[in-house]
């Protein structure tokens, strides 16, 4: 008998169906020589200090080290944090299934986290059977069948597990030590720090404070209007004057002027290629920008579409495709273009066009997000929005470039320089899918029929205007901006960033105000407590992902990595103890 372990019930049932294991039991499926069971996500975690009998922590006890055992996931109940009863019961089912089989197939998420989940489960239950790895990028029947026919040895993923386990231990070391240290320093225990969550919270709070303390600045832009070929064009003074008296004087001079002299005309045509295929971060950003979906919603929706066999594995950082996957796309695209909503693009799609979408070599990393050949059934509104984004991006990738003409005209009026910058689209190409002209506008005004201007041409002034402007404060972060910030700062991965935001929300450090993410009073208190300290600095651990990638490649040992982490932990806890002498406050004070 062969056991198969997945990390979601619906994934387990889908694999069981394909393999003919159709008999439903309590917590698993069986039949045709297979027993297929599942976890409910990650049900095990590194033990906390209290789990090994450490009730009180003194400064001399730092750095705290993780106990050498795992514990069942805890959930908050009326009586405090207790083991999740659903996890406890399912672990018993999994143990029963694994004990009844002589071979185990790991079919958990094909990722670092999925590998760690299985390895922790395998060790926690004391398994000794040989194991194999199912590594697939979609849940179509074809992908499952092909994956089962090409199972991989588990030891091929040893370094992947080491990278995941190293990241897990490093997060424990920094998060637990800094949290215990800050709670001890400020005298109460309802604060939590983390190597990614704290820098993200600090950045959210920093921008919030910047907005609160903002003082608007005045400026007075001056415009002139000129007429040519019965078309009125408005040109702007190249500098927005900040002294009202000077702006008013320029305005009066322009009113008195009879003509404007064209000093320069610049035109250039640019071919703008389609954006690359989606990875999770780019999908989250676009779904937030265009449809106001949060990063958490997008990841959950994308996971649902994956489990419905409609898209490939979503939690990927790649925007490329291996050649073997690329070569399977023509029939998928043809099937998609046969649908009435996409039929109009059938003549412009070029399936041989985007060769730069192909990876130089195949890797075990998941490729860019693409649709599968499975036709969507009934999807809810938000699912359809995300699915349409993915379909649209694939169409864009296989369409010709967008051709745009950019024009800049400079002129002199009243001895001062004015300018107009316009664009017009000559050939839409891929831009025709969603008609989002702002992508190619580059801050210019649209002008589809621009009059022809000539250098040294003299034209009459048709009017002028003076506007009083006040600068606006920076807006609070949106999900799009937060995902972009974390991506550029090297904070977390595409798989973990959503959980960071979820943690900050659950711990009531941040909240949503419309589409914006703002800190709560509790979050602001924690920010003021750690502001300027290493634990709130995004650069403190930004190099970790590079080192974890080296562990994956076998270029760095776990011991070397964790030795460096311990040095960082000592620096962080030492700084907290120096900056915050013990100061007792009532429990729950913020």
Language-model-detected regions and their locations in the chain:
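Helical mechanochemical/support elements of P-loop NTPase systems and associated helical scaffolds
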Residues: 11, 15, 86-97, 110-121, ...
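Generic, well-ordered alpha-helical scaffold segments in large soluble proteins
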Residues: 14, 18, 97-100, 120-124, ...
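Active-site phosphate-binding and catalytic loops of NTP-dependent enzymes
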Residues: 23-27, 154-159, 180-184, 209-214, ...
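Long, highly charged, low-complexity internal segments
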Residues: 35, 43-83, 191-303, 307, ...
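Core structural elements
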Residues: 166-179, 224-226, 270-282, 296, ...
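Accessory beta->alpha helical hairpin/"wing" motif in late/C-terminal subdomains of nucleic-acid enzymes
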Residues: 312-337, 350, 499-535
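Leucine-rich, amphipathic alpha-helical/linker segments
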Residues: 339-367, 535-580
């Amino acid at each position: 008998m062969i056991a198969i372990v997945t990390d979601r019930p619906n994934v387990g049932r889908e694999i069981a169906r394909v393999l003919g294991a159709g008999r439903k039991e309590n917590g698993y499926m069986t039949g045709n020589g297979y027993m297929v069971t599942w976890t409910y996500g990650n049900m095990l975690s590194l033990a906390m200090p209290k789990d090994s009998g450490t009730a009180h922590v003194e400064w001399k006890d730092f750095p705290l080290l993780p106990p050498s055992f795992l514990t069942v996931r805890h959930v908050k109940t009326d009586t405090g944090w207790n083991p999740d009863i659903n996890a406890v019961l399912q672990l018993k089912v999994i143990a029963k299934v694994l004990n009844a089989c002589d071979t185990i197939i790991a079919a958990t998420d094909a990722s670092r986290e999925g590998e760690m989940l299985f390895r922790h489960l395998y060790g926690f239950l004391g398994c000794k059977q040989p194991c194999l790895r199912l590594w697939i990028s979609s849940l179509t029947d074809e992908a499952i069948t092909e994956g089962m026919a090409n199972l991989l040895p588990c030891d091929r993923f040893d370094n992947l597990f080491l990278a995941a386990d190293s990241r897990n231990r490093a997060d424990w070391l920094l998060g637990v030590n800094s949290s215990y240290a800050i709670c001890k320093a400020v005298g109460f225990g309802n604060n939590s720090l983390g190597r990614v969550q704290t820098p993200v919270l600090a950045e959210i709070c920093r921008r919030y404070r910047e907005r609160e303390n903002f003082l608007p600045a005045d400026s007075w832009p001056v415009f002139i209007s000129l007429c040519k070929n019965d078309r009125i064009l408005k040109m702007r003074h190249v500098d927005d004057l900040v002294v009202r008296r000077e702006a008013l004087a320029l305005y009066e001079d322009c009113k008195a002027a009879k003509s404007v002299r064209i000093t320069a005309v610049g035109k250039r045509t640019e071919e703008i290629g389609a954006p690359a295929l989606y990875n999770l971060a780019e999908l989250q950003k676009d779904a937030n920008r265009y449809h106001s979906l949060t990063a958490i919603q997008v990841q959950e929706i994308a996971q649902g579409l994956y489990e419905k066999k409609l898209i490939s594995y979503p939690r990927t950082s790649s925007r490329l495709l291996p050649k073997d996957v690329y070569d399977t796309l023509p029939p998928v695209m043809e099937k998609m273009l046969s649908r009435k909503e996409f039929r109009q693009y059938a003549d412009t799609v070029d399936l041989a066009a985007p060769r730069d979408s192909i990876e130089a070599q195949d890797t075990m990393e998941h490729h860019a997000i693409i649709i599968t050949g499975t036709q969507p059934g009934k999807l809810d509104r938000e699912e359809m929005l995300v699915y349409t984004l993915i379909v649209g991006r694939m169409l864009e990738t296989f369409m010709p470039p967008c051709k745009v003409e950019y024009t800049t005209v400079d002129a002199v009026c009243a001895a001062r320089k004015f300018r107009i910058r316009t664009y017009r689209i000559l050939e839409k190409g891929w831009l025709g899918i969603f008609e989002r002209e702002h992508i190619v506008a580059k801050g210019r005004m649209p002008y589809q029929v621009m009059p022809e201007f000539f250098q040294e041409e003299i034209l009459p002034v048709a009017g002028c205007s003076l506007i009083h402007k006040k600068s606006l404060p920076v807006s609070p972060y949106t999900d799009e901006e937060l995902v972009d910030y974390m991506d550029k700062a090297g904070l977390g991965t595409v798989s973990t960033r959503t959980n960071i935001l979820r943690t900050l929300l659950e711990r009531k450090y941040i909240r949503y105000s419309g589409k914006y993410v703002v800190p709560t009073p509790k979050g602001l208190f924690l920010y003021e407590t750690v502001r300027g300290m290493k634990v709130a600095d995004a650069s403190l651990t930004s190099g970790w992902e590079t080192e974890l990638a080296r562990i994956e490649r076998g270029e760095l040992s776990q011991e070397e990595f964790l030795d460096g982490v311990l040095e960082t932990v000592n620096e962080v806890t030492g700084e907290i103890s120096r900056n915050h002498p013990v100061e007792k406050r009532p429990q729950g004070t913020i």
